[in-house]
Swiss-Prot record:
Entry domain remark: The N-terminal region consists of two globular folded domains that contain prolyl isomerase and chaperone activities.
Region of interest (Disordered), residue spans: 164-185
Binding site for Ni(2+): 163-164, 178
Residue span of region PPIase first part: 1-74
Keyword Cytoplasm appears in the UniProt entry: yes
Main location: cytoplasm
Subcellular location per the Swiss-Prot or TrEMBL entry: Cytoplasm
Residues annotated as domain PPIase FKBP-type: 1-99
Gene: slyD
GO cellular component: cytoplasm
Designated name of the protein: FKBP-type peptidyl-prolyl cis-trans isomerase SlyD
Species whose genome carries this gene: Helicobacter pylori (strain J99 / ATCC 700824) (Campylobacter pylori J99)
Record keyword Isomerase present: yes
Length: 185
């Protein structure tokens, strides 16, 4: 086993994984038999609970871990619900549970879920869809590789964008990565 720590960004890990909500047999996301997920250690590109488990894992061995919400996508925050005027969604055929994307004041893309709507208002949920969920991962570390200074610098600019990004654009919480059924390619 190699010795890694979250503060030392010098290597990238390559993993295969599948994730389920604890107690469910439904796979939420998986890259098994697909391209490996690669992330820079310590760059906040995947959820912290999975990153910690990867650092302790044996290369080539399947591991299983249960990750609490606090080390995954955070606890569900009722304060992340917002009622907005329906006219802000003009031209959009709304459905309960649909994902919508917007921009924050600092031009960051943010994902939200339509919880409910009426003729005059829409209830928008800015929690990550997996907030409050305990996740069960099965994963295998395929290997580690050294990263260049350019990759380290780029990871600071990319962190927080997209599914595997640090904050993932999901309410500004720590976390990101694996489990939200996004494309990782």
């Amino acid at each position: 086993m190699q010795n890694h720590d979250l503060e030392s960004i010098k290597q990238a890990a390559l993993i295969e994984y599948e994730v389920r909500e604890q107690g469910s047999s439904d796979v939420l996301d998986s890259n098994i038999s697909k391209e490996p997920l690669e992330f820079i250690i310590g760059a906040n590109q995947i959820i912290v609970g999975l990153e910690k488990a990867v650092l302790k894992a044996q290369i080539g061995e399947w591991e299983e871990i249960v990750i609490a919400p606090e080390e995954a996508y955070g606890v569900y925050e009722s304060g992340y619900l917002q009622e907005v005027p329906r006219d802000q969604f003009e031209g959009i055929e709304l459905e309960k549970g649909m994902s919508v994307f917007g921009q924050t004041e600092d031009n960051q893309t943010i994902q939200a879920t339509i919880k409910d709507f009426s003729n005059t208002h829409v209830m928008v949920d800015y929690n990550h869809p997996l907030a409050g969920k305990t996740l069960a991962f099965r994963f295998k570390v395929l290997g580690f590789r050294e990263v260049s200074e350019e990759e380290i610098l780029a990871s600071h600019h990319d962190s927080g964008t997209g599914c595997c990004g640090g904050h993932g654009g999901h309410g500004g919480k720590k976390g990101g990565g694996c489990g939200c059924s996004c494309s990782h390619g």
